[in-house]
Amino acid sequence: MINDHESVIDVGSDDERENFEDEEDTTTVYSSDPLSRPTMDRSLAAKMYIEQYYINAQQSVKERGQRRKDLELKLENMKLSSKESNDLRKELDKKESDYMRIKRLKLKRSDFEVIRIIGRGAFGEVSLVRHRESNDLYAMKRLKKSEMLKKEQAAHVRAERDVLASANTNWVVKLYYSFQDDNYLYLIMEYLPGGDMMSLLIKYDIFTENQARFYIAETILAIESVHTLGYIHRDIKPDNLLLDSKGHVKLCDLGLCTGFHRLHSSEFYQMLVGDAMTIKMKLIEATPLTQTERIASWKKARRALAYSAVGTPDYTAPEVFLQIGYNKEVDWWSLGVILYEMVVGHPPFLSDNTTETCLKILNCKETLQIPTDMGLSKEVIDLIKRLVCEKDRYKSADEIKLHPFFKGVNWDNIRNQSAPFVPELKSPTDTSNFDIYEEIPNDIDDDDNNNNNNSNNNINLNDNINSNCTYTTPTKKSNIMGKGNIKDKDLAFIGFTFKGFDAVNKSPTNRRNVESIFNTNNSTTTSTTK
């Protein structure tokens, strides 16, 4: 399988890199102390830039060679004429040249027209956008740098960018570009018009077991693809299961950017655990609402809670709360909770507040109750119990696939089957499967205006060195080796910029081409770890 994503971080065009050459020094004179903060910051930024540059150069050569090797292996197994084979080789060569040009482009927010906001959370928003030059549609995730740092999210957003950049699978949302400006980080991803699984659950309330089987099977393959990359998702929930135009599942939010991490304090949860009797008493006392009232209240606030800074703990495994050491099994716990919600109509540990939910999860052996009056099959009940448990939980996708609940599932071809619910789309820009959000006045171009207003004082080198380093200078462009101060938030996001090889495959074609050859089996979970 070809490696569709090339983890090459844009280091700017040739003329931009000339900024590193010596220039006439017209900058403000600072302390000559070699250990001063500005000197240390510039040294660190230069070191990070140089290291990243050579890592990328080496990786670029390696991945380009791998794409050629993959093509030749595919051609060996296809009965093509010599002319057809040579045409495909020439097409790959052209794509490689196009990709080199794409990597030299400097992207900015004004390159994209915002059509509509389709999601908003504590740290930013997601919009359907159109690239002004190519007219291609994307989902643009915009995150505020200051909030990322204040809420200690820098590592999480970088993790999401790294996983998306390295993912070569149809089970994870594609990342085409990432870039930044003075105030924001941007992830330019494929637009999936089907909405998310949470919207389906809100709309239909309860799935049949056949419907649940299909979506859980696809979610297993999606989680497996992330595990194959060497990652644990840790935030599997209906909000993070997106649906494409045909209703098939793709994973998103791979960085815990809106997850429940702010409450992941071992001291906090150890305090909640206490002794077993204390917890039982708290659970007995903390029940002011009836179950019917509790479910109704939860459904009403479902979407707002998903986009809050705290998030929801409903799908989180107990070992994540306690931070006592956990592995891939935490994602299978979340899968079991989602299955329960699909066939019952609400999560298994639904409570009046997050503290009570956490207490129930930590005592899942006693608090997990599966309704006996809903006609659920013994297979689905057993699968839930094998996933939502502290001990003897399933450890791998292969184990789960063998469960009787999945009898008859065609794992190798499921993505080519019809989904239970296929989105009804009136146009490529249809956003009817997303909630409606109001535009924030004067927000669309604030980054570009800010850059223009500060152009005489702060020189933005974020696309030149994959950061957003600014340097004080009275009249002319500076460079990373010059005088000035580097902001703390700038150092945190050096290396964020990315341009993926998939960007050259955006324009569809009906004839046999390189992209179609490398995607002859869309149901596979093959992926390459960077």
UniProtKB/Swiss-Prot annotation:
Enzyme class: transferase
One Pfam family of this chain: Pkinase
UniProt subcellular location: Cytoplasm
Biased segments, Acidic residues type: 12-26
Annotated catalytic residues: D235 (proton acceptor)
InterPro entries: AGC-kinase_C, Kinase-like_dom_sf, Prot_kinase_dom, Protein_kinase_ATP_BS, Rho-assoc_Ser/Thr_Kinase, Ser/Thr_kinase_AS
GO terms for MF: ATP binding; protein serine kinase activity; protein serine/threonine kinase activity
Catalytic activity: L-seryl-[protein] + ATP = O-phospho-L-seryl-[protein] + ADP + H(+); L-threonyl-[protein] + ATP = O-phospho-L-threonyl-[protein] + ADP + H(+)
GO biological processes: intracellular signal transduction; positive regulation of phagocytosis, engulfment
Gene3D superfamilies per record: Phosphorylase Kinase, domain 1 (3.30.200.20), Transferase(Phosphotransferase) domain 1 (1.10.510.10)
Domain Protein kinase as annotated: residue spans: 112-406
Record's compositionally biased regions (Low complexity): 450-461
EC number assigned by the record: 2.7.11.1
Coiled coil: 56-108
Underlying gene: ndrA
Domain named AGC-kinase C-terminal: residues: 407-508
Annotated GO CC locations: centrosome; cytoplasm; mitotic spindle
Similarity section: Belongs to the protein kinase superfamily. AGC Ser/Thr protein kinase family.
Keyword presence, Nucleotide-binding: yes
Keywords noted in UniProt: ATP-binding, Coiled coil, Cytoplasm, Kinase, Nucleotide-binding, Phosphoprotein, Serine/threonine-protein kinase, Transferase
Protein name, entry field: Probable serine/threonine-protein kinase ndrA
